[in-house]
Amino acid sequence: LVAVKSFWGHLRKGRIVILSDGTLTTEDRAVLAWHCGNPEIIDIADVDHNGFPAGGAWERFLSILDRRADDYVIQLDSDTVTLGRPDVVADAIAANRSFTLLGGPEWDIGVRTCTDYVPPSPDNPGEARHIQSRMERALAQIEGAGHHGYIRGCAGFAGFARGGNGRETARFFHDEMARLLGHQAMAEWGSEQVTSSFVVANDPDPVLLPYSQYGNYWAEPWDADCRFMHFVGAHR
């Protein structure tokens, strides 16, 4: 509720759609109806995977892609707080441009082609094995890599412009990564985030949110002009 009401209260537009994991009680739904304006609630069991992985936030992502033909859709994680008016986001919506929160300040470099993108060097073997690292190392090998873009974004806060091609771009990327890394790899937690970043990067003229105003919290002070914070991992 903090995530939704802080964002909705500052943006002052839009309607709420909630993906339920199946545990919402009647009382939960009544609270959400009161605070969120009778939101549409999607049962996770009703999402059609159609060859995409189950779990790992894929149902959320697929639900967004299925709705963007007619609406501008924003993914908002529950571990976020909007601290001020999100003007860059409001402008992106008005211009019908997709946007994404960045993975860190070092990624404020613009979209790179999949052949030009240089993934960060892992700090330890665990990072090297992480699905995001493996997928990013494989980017240059996808079909037509030089004609596709990528940015290391964060799926916790991303906007998808109205009128997109639904699941088409995500399907292409998923299938290419499954070919290169295996279908089991694409079921690992984190594969959806890389796919989300790929989809945003290949939408027309995407907006990369300035990290000083829209960031991830790592127990460090944020700028006075910070508008949005994503509290990741142990910092939730």
How does the language model describe each region?
Residues 6-14:
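Short, acidic, metal-binding catalytic loop of nucleotide-sugar glycosyltransferases
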Residues 77-81:
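The conserved acidic donor/metal-binding loop of glycosyltransferases
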Residues 15-23, 102-103:
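Short internal beta-strands
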Residues 73:
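Short aromatic/hydrophobic "clamp" motif used to bind/position activated sugar donors
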Residues 130-236:
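A glycosyltransferase accessory/donor-loop signature
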Residues 24-70:
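Active-site-proximal specificity loops/subdomain of glycosyltransferases
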Residues 82-121:
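Conserved donor-nucleotide/metal-binding helix-loop-beta segment in metal-dependent transferases, i.e.
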Residues 1-2:
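N-proximal low-complexity "stem/linker" segments adjacent to membrane-targeting elements
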